[in-house]
Amino acid sequence: MSLRIYNTLSRAIEPLIPLQPGHVRMYVCGMTVYDLCHLGHARAMVAFDVVQRWLKVSGLRVTYVRNVTDIDDKIIKRALENGESIRALTERMVDALHQDADALGIERPTHEPRATEFVPQMLSLIGRLEQKGLAYQAVNGDVNYAVRKFPGYGKLSGKSLDELRAGERVAVADGKDDPLDFVLWKTAKPNEPLDAKWDSVYGQGRPGWHIECSAMCGQMLGETVDIHGGGADLQFPHHENEIAQSEGATGKPLASIWMHNGFVTRDNEKMSKSLGNFFTIRDILARYDAETTRFFIIRAHYRSALNHSDAHLDDARNSLKRLYTALDLVAPEPLLEIDWRQPFAARFKAAMDEDFGTPEAVAVMFELATEVNKTRDPKLAGLLKALGACLGLLQGDPKVFLQAGATLDAASIAALIAQRTAAKAAKNFAEADRIRQDLLARGIVLKDSAAGTVWEVVA
């Protein structure tokens, strides 16, 4: 197989060699559902949606698991603030998550396990770690992971225990043997709601965040997965802790390849609520269409930082219009399958096979669109649409996309175009130009060709 992926663990690009030939098992850490999804979530979902799409295009069977964290300190706090049950809050947020993902054209994962459905498996895993001397119960009732007893700790993030200890400025708290230790099981507190605690041999409590993913991943995909992914912010400590838990229990690698998508910034500053530059997916979709938002994410490489600004989104929409204009100009001939020997297709595939190189793949699509404009070849237009499908793009009606957001209805625009055509026929070019300029002032540009006049909306 020619597909190669950057492995965060080895810090090198490696060939993807599925442990089960022809079948890729991929686990991606999903959302903690206490609030609406933001642009960072959108980036992760789109990035791994492209991954699963390309794996399928490459002829592989994909079992894609993306979890939902539906029990967490933030969830408990928000539910109490809202005066609602944890279940009511998380159900509402999962519904919103699905609506946002559907709007962005994100295919559902094969499985979407929820943490609360796997508490017995989490307790079983904690028990195995305790038996191996990697976990202990603290005086406050919490069960913690003994980080220094796992020899491989820090291998994913490249952090040494000495570096981590030097950066630790707090005293040992809550009965931890070491400040680096992390919680596996949190003992219940008196003021917490009943739906935030489970019975266990350690007393009532709830699982820690890190043990949730280790248990769900192992239960659904086995001891070693082909790809484990998530945002760059999860690399440490979450994924480092997952490795310690899973590999500490099984003695086997948790994942063959670790993938991490890059951060999202706003005008080159880190996006955060405290800076007031934080945007939910719905904030963005209120101003930009979903396909433009998806294209904005895809045209940057998944590992690079993604800088969000109105100018970048405007540019993404105008760029996407160029592709749709080619498909509007020439009706695409449907392709039963892509001939990957075709030069444009071959270059697209080479880009995607090299660590999902979407910037290079998109560049090929623009070159192909230019060729469609020159040749008016329906087969090339069909290829452009088919390549777009590999990325979840260009599957809409070109006219609908190009004319979206018009300040006049289509019938009124058609009437003005007819008036302009009549003025040109009567050699009243001043009137024809006036109509063109009036429409342009409304954000509508006219394009004349031998086949007639068409219009589209400009940003």
From Swiss-Prot:
Output the superkingdom of the source species. Bacteria
What the entry lists under NCBIfam families is as follows: cysS
Q: Does this UniProt record's set of keywords contain Transport?
A: no
Naming one, the record's GO cellular component terms include: cytosol
Which keywords describe this protein according to UniProt?
Answer: Aminoacyl-tRNA synthetase, ATP-binding, Cytoplasm, Ligase, Metal-binding, Nucleotide-binding, Protein biosynthesis, Zinc
The protein's name: Cysteine--tRNA ligase
Q: Reaction(s) catalyzed by this protein?
A: tRNA(Cys) + L-cysteine + ATP = L-cysteinyl-tRNA(Cys) + AMP + diphosphate
What subcellular locations does the record give?
Cytoplasm
What positions does the entry give for Zn(2+) binding?
Answer: C29, C213, H238, E242
EC number in record: 6.1.1.16
Q: Which organism is it from?
A: Albidiferax ferrireducens (strain ATCC BAA-621 / DSM 15236 / T118)
Q: Which residues bind ATP?
A: K273
Q: Where is this motif: 'HIGH' region?
A: 31-41
This entry's Gene Ontology molecular function terms read: ATP binding; cysteine-tRNA ligase activity; zinc ion binding
Q: Motif 'KMSKS' region at which residues?
A: 270-274
Pfam families reported for this sequence: CysS_C, DALR_2, tRNA-synt_1e
The entry's free-text remark on the cofactor is:
Binds 1 zinc ion per subunit.
Primary location recorded for the protein, binned into one broad class: cytoplasm
Q: What's this protein's family per the entry? A: Belongs to the class-I aminoacyl-tRNA synthetase family.
